[in-house]
């Protein structure tokens, strides 16, 4: 009988109040029920605490804000053998969940991967290139955070996790994961909120993201890039230094 894997879903939250409640409701209805951990660095932690209390979700408070740090700390508290890192503004259905578990149950060589992104929804003008994007992502493309990256827990720690990076943590981890072993990009496609694109425009946002990735590839520090992206000057000055006393796990019952 093939092994049935367990899943821990880690959700980094930074002021995602609008989306968190509905996302937790959807995830709480998955079967078999995964372990769900919200790793929060919001300005108003009390709001997130109340949302997690409503859904009886484990809550992790991480200060100061850093997506890589939030993901790493969430992974440390997780108990399942598969880790799924999922954004609060991204959909995740039973079909996605079944696809994830089935992939590991049927192929013992898989170490991790992500889901295909529905780019037609975000970039309608690029519809003709969606087939190219699919092939590229499945074989050599970077696995971004909004694709719900997943990995065996043992492999995650062997690779050093997200290294606490405040930005480009997904790009960095994707490179390590693809270099290590068999990575699978799964269907069905997932959709994310258009909130970032609606504020700046689709093309401008895409160009901004591409420019940041180019700078990262050229060797610019992720902490400097985080300052540019978030407008938070403290990000570059921290240089990856976080207090070990900044993490608190709350089991909301």
Residue ranges with predicted function:
Residues 40-48, 90:
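A conserved acidic beta->alpha catalytic loop
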Residues 1-2, 175-253:
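Hydrophobic helical membrane-anchoring modules
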Residues 95-125:
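Conserved donor NDP-sugar-binding/catalytic core segment of glycosyltransferases
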Residues 112-124, 133-151:
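A recurrent flexible, glycine/aromatic-enriched loop bordering the glycosyltransferase active site
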Residues 62-78:
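Glycine-rich, basic loop-to-helix element that forms the pyrophosphate-binding segment
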Residues 15-29:
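Short, well-formed alpha-helical segments that are part of the catalytic scaffolds
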Residues 83:
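Short aromatic/hydrophobic "clamp" motif used to bind/position activated sugar donors
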Residues 33-43, 60:
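Short beta-strand/loop segment that forms part of the nucleotide-sugar
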